[in-house]
């Protein structure tokens, strides 16, 4: 009896250890996949996502150009929360090539570069109706010391092709670096995977070209997907092997003559990156009040002029009748 209990205990212990190990492995794989997705590449490799030329660095890996749009209020008051709406349009019916070569839905991501002093609004300052529109999005600062640069993604494109950032405007009364001025806002938006990794290597979401001029001797399909293309170099007689990962489709065949840099595959990329900008005015309350008082005084002056004119006309009419 004692032996049975010991055996059962050992079996349960082994089962728990295996289960925990499996969960750890799965968790590591999932989070590794997420960590290798944008915008983490930009955060790791660039101090600032916007270069001196105005180009946002995401374009270094996402080579196709696609549209993106941003909508912000024309002006905002100090210490108020407003929406910055980033639109990343694309055909939600299309599928992209995943890292394993299979087809799947597109993700989207965005980077929002705000003026100094503007930052992500705290949760307790965001109105309930705005929270409902934001959904389950998680925003983070590009750097701990760059609270004015926000990134989000990757998130499912079908659900979040329109991303709403809750932004808190600065208050010049408490923030000496903030001023009542017109400010630029920059945005970069992406849909789908990139074509180039930060180390310069290609992903499987791009065109693969021939590395040499020659004749295709053999095309071998690899067991785990992808191809090995054996090319007889016509210049020196050597054989060159070009590797194509799972995903891109071949557009060449055995016996075909090719030239260096000639495409061996189609371009599977259906996504792309775009950037845009907008302007926003940090408005002084006293200026607004002064403007309203000015308009009120103009309206009152017009009313008094009309009344005075009518009074003058009555006097003239009375004198004529007399």
From Swiss-Prot:
Protein name: Cytochrome f
Residues involved in heme binding: 38, 58, 61-62
An example Gene Ontology CC term for this record: chloroplast thylakoid membrane
Membrane-protein topology: Single-pass membrane protein
GO biological process, one term: photosynthesis
Residues spanning the signal sequence: 1-37
Required cofactor names: heme
Reported function: Component of the cytochrome b6-f complex, which mediates electron transfer between photosystem II (PSII) and photosystem I (PSI), cyclic electron flow around PSI, and state transitions.
SUPFAM superfamilies on file: Cytochrome f subunit of the cytochrome b6f complex, transmembrane anchor, Cytochrome f, large domain, Rudiment single hybrid motif
GO molecular function (one): heme binding
Note on cofactor: Binds 1 heme group covalently.
Main location: plastid
A Pfam family hit: Apocytochr_F_N
Quaternary structure and interacting proteins, as annotated: The 4 large subunits of the cytochrome b6-f complex are cytochrome b6, subunit IV (17 kDa polypeptide, petD), cytochrome f and the Rieske protein, while the 4 small subunits are PetG, PetL, PetM and PetN. The complex functions as a dimer.
Residue ranges of the TM segments: 285-307
Similarity-based family: Belongs to the cytochrome f family.
Keywords attached to this entry: Chloroplast, Electron transport, Heme, Iron, Membrane, Metal-binding, Photosynthesis, Plastid, Signal, Thylakoid, Transmembrane, Transmembrane helix, Transport
Cross-referenced InterPro entries: Cyt-f_TM, Cyt_f, Cyt_f_lg_dom, Cyt_f_lg_dom_sf, Rudment_hybrid_motif
Subcellular location: Plastid, Chloroplast thylakoid membrane
């Amino acid at each position: 009896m004692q032996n049975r209990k010991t055996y059962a205990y050992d079996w349960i212990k082994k089962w728990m250890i295996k289960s925990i190990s499996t969960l750890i492995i799965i968790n590591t794989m999932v989070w590794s996949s997420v960590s290798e997705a944008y915008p983490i590449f930009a955060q790791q490799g660039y101090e600032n996502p916007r270069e001196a030329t105005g180009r946002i660095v995401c374009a270094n890996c996402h080579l196709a150009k696609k549209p993106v749009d941003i909508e912000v209020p024309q002006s905002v008051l100090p210490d108020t929360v407003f929406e910055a709406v980033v639109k990343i349009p694309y055909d939600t019916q299309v599928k992209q090539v995943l890292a394993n070569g299979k087809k799947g839905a597109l993700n989207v991501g965005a980077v929002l570069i705000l003026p100094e002093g503007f930052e992500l609004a705290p949760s307790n300052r965001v109105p309930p109706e705005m929270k409902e529109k934001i959904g389950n999005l998680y925003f983070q600062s590009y750097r701990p010391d760059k609270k004015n640069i926000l990134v989000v993604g990757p998130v499912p494109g079908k659900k979040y092709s329109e991303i709403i950032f809750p932004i808190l405007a600065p208050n010049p009364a408490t923030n000496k670096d903030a001023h009542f001025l017109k400010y630029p806002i920059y945005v970069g938006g992406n849909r789908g995977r990139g074509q180039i990794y930060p180390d310069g290597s290609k992903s499987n979401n791009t065109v693969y070209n021939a590395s040499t001029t020659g004749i295709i001797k053999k095309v071998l399909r690899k067991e785990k997907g992808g191809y090995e293309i054996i090319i007889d170099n016509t210049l020196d007689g050597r054989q060159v092997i070009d590797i194509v990962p799972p995903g891109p489709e071949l557009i060449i065949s055995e016996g075909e003559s090719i030239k260096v840099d000639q495409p061996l595959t189609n371009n599977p990329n259906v996504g792309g990156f775009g950037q845009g900008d907008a302007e926003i005015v940090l408005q002084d309350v006293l200026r607004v009040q002064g403007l309203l008082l000015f308009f009120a005084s103009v309206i009152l002056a017009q009313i008094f002029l009309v009344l005075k004119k009518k009074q003058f006309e009555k006097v003239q009419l009375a004198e004529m009748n007399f």
